């Protein structure tokens, strides 16, 4: 379980980086939404998650429990029941062709990053250099936290298992990683070095993101992420591949699942809002999407 969780947290951090690309103009201040409308015999629910969070901040409220209880199946970003998922995650995080990020860093930047990793994680780039920068960034995000990270994905998967409900995925691991891989390596590396140079500022920024998430204010959350000092550069140019295209690809999956049986959908909060977000796309198709909490 520990290895599985580490792999998932690596990917979770990557997705957190991806969320920084979009400023969501959310009209509704909520994370949980009820979906009703044409072809839906019973309501389904959407929940916006934050991929890296402390256990004390992971709140499974009564409305969430009810939504999960009313659902007959659960959809997360990935199929958590897939036994090959852990191995696939580990492989997807590795640099291609045996490359090492050491080859891509200046001597000074290498020293800064190597020292940071040794101090925070007791291992340096000799061990971590074979990871893609965006994968290493996800591990570095965990060093900013005062806890062992918890996961909404794992929690919802465990709740579903306890209730003998099937867990399915909105997309494949390959599709998710293909979107993340469109972020240039140079930008990814800059984010790593910037965080290593300014760890206190990075920790403060991350804490602010979590605090804003807990207010359920999606617009403010995405604004905070978009202004991140540690995204490595202007990520807005990759908004289409990281969020909008994925939202559009998810829509028919969501529609089909919700028509078959009441479903609880949980995915990164950044996918909920704005004109290309899941909420707007569903409303454009004639569904009623109502904020719950």
Give, region by region, the residue ranges found by the protein language model.
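A cross-kingdom marker for long, charged
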Residues: 236-293
């Amino acid at each position: 379980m520990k290895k599985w969780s580490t792999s998932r947290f690596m990917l979770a951090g990557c997705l957190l980086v991806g969320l920084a690309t979009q400023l969501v103009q959310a009209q509704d201040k909520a994370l949980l939404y009820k979906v009703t409308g044409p072809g839906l015999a019973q309501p389904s629910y959407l929940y916006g998650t934050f991929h890296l969070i402390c256990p004390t901040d992971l709140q499974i409220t009564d409305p969430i429990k009810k939504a999960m209880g009313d659902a007959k199946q659960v959809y997360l970003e990935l199929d958590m029941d897939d036994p090959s998922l852990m191995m696939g995650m580990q492989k997807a995080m590795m640099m291609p062709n045996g490359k090492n990020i050491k080859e891509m860093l200046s001597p000074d930047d290498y020293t800064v990053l190597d020292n940071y990793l040794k101090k925070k994680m007791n291992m340096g780039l000799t061990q971590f250099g074979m990871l893609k920068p965006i994968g290493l960034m996800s591990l570095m995000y965990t060093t900013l936290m005062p806890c062992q990270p918890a996961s909404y994905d794992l929690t919802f998967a465990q709740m579903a298992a306890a209730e003998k409900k099937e867990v399915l995925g909105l997309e494949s691991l390959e599709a998710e990683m293909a979107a993340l891989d469109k972020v240039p390596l140079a930008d990814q590396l800059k984010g790593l070095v910037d965080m290593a140079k300014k760890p206190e500022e990075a920790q403060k920024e991350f804490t602010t993101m979590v605090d804003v998430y807990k207010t359920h204010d999606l617009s403010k959350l995405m604004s905070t992420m978009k202004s991140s000092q540690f995204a490595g550069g202007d990520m807005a140019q990759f908004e289409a591949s990281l969020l909008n295209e994925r939202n559009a690809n998810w829509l028919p999956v969501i529609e089909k699942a919700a028509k078959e049986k009441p479903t609880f959908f949980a995915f990164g909060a950044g996918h909920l809002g704005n004109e290309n977000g899941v909420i707007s796309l569903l409303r454009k198709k004639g569904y009623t999407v109502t904020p719950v909490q």
